[in-house]
Amino acid sequence: QGTSGPYGDFLDHTIDRVVDIGLIVAIGFNSEFGVDLSLALGAALLTLMGSYMGTQAQSVGLGRIYGGFSRADRMVITVLGMILASLQAAGIFALTVTITGDFGSFLVLGLEEMNGFGIAVVFSAWGGMYTFITRFISARGMLLGSVPES
């Protein structure tokens, strides 16, 4: 309607979160590419928690905290992962990465083989965790007065 306000900001953030979660969970439903639904749900939860830290800081008067793995970062990684998976499905491009060892398995959250969808989910999970921790530490510092407000 050409106007902005608190409701518009609220609606924008709500739709962003629904889309973020929807994309990651939809990837998890595609069992053809070996991404487990429970892994996708975990990645969606971590993504949501990272976003929550930014809005929670705003709710206690700090202003919106941005930083970490942003929505734009997640979207770029997800779109690139989808393109890569499409090329793999069409037989145009082959990516076969077999993960060995406990640490390697930990880094890719238990996926046995990586592909475009797996990359998107793993990056979303680790990015969500990184964002959650980064924003929490930033908000904590501002609330306790040890870090100037950015």
Where are these regions (language model features)?
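Juxtamembrane helix-capping/reentrant segments at transmembrane boundaries
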Residues: 2-16, 65-69, 150
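Hydrophobic alpha-helical transmembrane segments
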Residues: 19, 23-150
